[in-house]
Amino acid sequence: LKNGIAKEYLFEGSYKMSQLDWQVENVILVGFDLDFELKNLYFGCNFSYGLYNFDGKMEDYDWLNMLSSDYTHYSCHNLSLSKDLDFSIDIGLMFPLEETGKNYVNLFAQYNFKNTMFEAKNGYYRYKEYGKISEGELSGLVITYNPIIESFLLGFGGNFYISKTFSFKSETAISLLSRGVCTDNHLLTKDIWKDAVFGKVFLKSKLEFAFDFGDRFSMIFGGNVENLPMLQGQTYINGYPSRNNTGGFSSFFYDFYFSYRIRIF
């Protein structure tokens, strides 16, 4: 199950004009891990896909009055995910701590690719302009948001056996570079906003516990935490670069999972 929030920003210079909070709750994920070891060298890939989002909402804030810190426009919508893909490839080195090689520390490099499609539907709005307040309800698909982010990371970790059948594994990685393209489609105004964003600090951590059943089978319970601070870059409006605006993206997600591991050889 996956939970968390992605935030979309629009700036004019250093002034924040807009922020959209895309909040997901209890997304069901399916996926797999494949790992191959050759002595102390290993290769791995991970794939996950979001099947269903039980609950979620999107909140849209605008600050159109630069003389006030209060937001002038607000809307709230139901959120659903039509796509949530996460793929990574690892290459690393293991350093055994004893003869069996079951206890080890490791260093690795990783490429990570994410492609998510958020959809905001129905909801209501409350706008304040020139001292007047207008309110109303919205129906149907209002906004879609598609951040596509790729990151290059370096990390370290280790695997440690507490008993003959019970072990835990921990890994932490930080990005050297993150970049992406985030596309916002406002269906009511028929405007498409696209941000080409860049940044460096992306932190990922994983902790999992494994129960072995013989030499080849394990049951695993684990969790991941990912924190991506602000990525920022050029904004394009309906295909044309904006002279005054820049866009931004940030996210924080965590998930818990059960899996079954089979060692083939």
State each model region's role.
Residues 102, 147-153, 161-169, 202:
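Short gly/pro-enriched beta-turn/loop segments at secondary-structure junctions
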Residues 35-43, 95-105, 162-168, 213-218, ...:
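Short loop/turn motifs that connect adjacent beta-strands in outer-membrane beta-barrel proteins
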Residues 180, 210, 218-222, 230:
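Extended, basic/helix-rich recognition subdomains
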Residues 82-90, 104, 156:
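A structural/positional concept
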Residues 3-27, 49-87, 113-149, 175-206, ...:
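Extracellular/periplasm-exposed beta-strand and loop segments of Gram-negative cell-envelope proteins
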